[in-house]
């Protein structure tokens, strides 16, 4: 039997559970881990948490992405082509993910009346975009922030491909290092360059190691300089999906499915 953790269960930083159910869940996690022939999870940091807790070897099987989801996507959506578009897709987890450094950099350029800054548009699509709206108002940049709310996946995939930059918000938490969401892999196979903001965790390092974008942490000055370069470039070049599929083949779901089978066959 394989016990697979796509996210941590009772150690999940986004949801700690409710008493008394969390006590029952702790017991269930211990029980199933004890019975499992193989325990798997999505990253080395999460594996270390589980190994320390359950005293068993934990194998790594990534979430991955199926490139055919893009190849077969017939949905065609466009962002405003008159703008330089930075796009974030997905949920923003309050207290863990924060676009404030980007807004602060944008505010500074607006106050400097930097040439072309009015051409920049930052779009958020997904659940809880109200958090982005509130922060945009706080920094006075709401006129250049667009929140679309929840959209179907086919639409999101299309928008990711036509954006000029994809914004990835890494977790500002010591416990966020091993969180590798499916959204990360969607971004990686989009063909669009990625900017990561937040504490530099494993997700940001994967983007940097594969030369898929830039990692800025929470450094407002670096983000400000990157925005200046973007205003000159306007529309950076794209990566070919065919080349990405070859370069990132070990991040595909097919590769990871085989990895799961290998873990099972070893026991």
Regions found by a protein language model. Name each.
Residues 45, 64:
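Carbohydrate-associated surface elements
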Residues 218-222, 232-266:
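A charged, aromatic-enriched C-terminal amphipathic alpha-helix characteristic of glycosyltransferases
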């Amino acid at each position: 039997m394989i016990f697979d953790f796509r996210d941590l269960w009772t150690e999940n930083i986004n949801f700690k559970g409710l008493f008394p159910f969390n006590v029952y869940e702790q017991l269930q996690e211990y029980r199933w881990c004890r019975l499992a022939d193989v325990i798997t999870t999505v990253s080395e940091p999460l594996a270390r948490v589980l190994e320390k807790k359950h005293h068993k070897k934990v194998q790594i099987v990534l979430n991955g992405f199926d490139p055919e989801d893009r190849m077969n996507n017939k949905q065609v959506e466009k962002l405003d082509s008159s703008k330089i578009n930075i796009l974030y897709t997905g949920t923003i987890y309050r207290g863990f993910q924060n676009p404030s450094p980007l807004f602060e950099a944008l505010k500074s350029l607006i106050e400097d009346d930097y040439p072309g800054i009015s051409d920049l548009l930052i779009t958020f699509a997904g659940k809880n975009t109200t958090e982005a709206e509130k922060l945009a108002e706080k920094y006075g940049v709401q006129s250049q922030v667009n929140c679309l709310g929840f959209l179907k996946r086919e639409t999101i995939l299309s928008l990711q491909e036509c954006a000029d930059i994809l914004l990835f918000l890494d977790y500002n938490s010591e416990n966020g290092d091993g969180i590798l969401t499916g959204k990360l892999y969607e971004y990686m196979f989009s063909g669009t360059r990625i900017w990561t903001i937040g504490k530099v965790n494993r997700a940001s390092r994967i983007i940097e190691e594969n030369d898929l974008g830039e990692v800025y942490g929470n450094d407002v000055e670096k983000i400000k300089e990157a925005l200046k370069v973007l205003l000159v470039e306007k529309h950076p070049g794209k990566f070919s999906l065919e080349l990405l599929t070859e370069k990132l083949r070990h991040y595909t779901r097919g590769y990871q499915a085989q990895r799961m089978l290998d873990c099972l066959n070893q026991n």
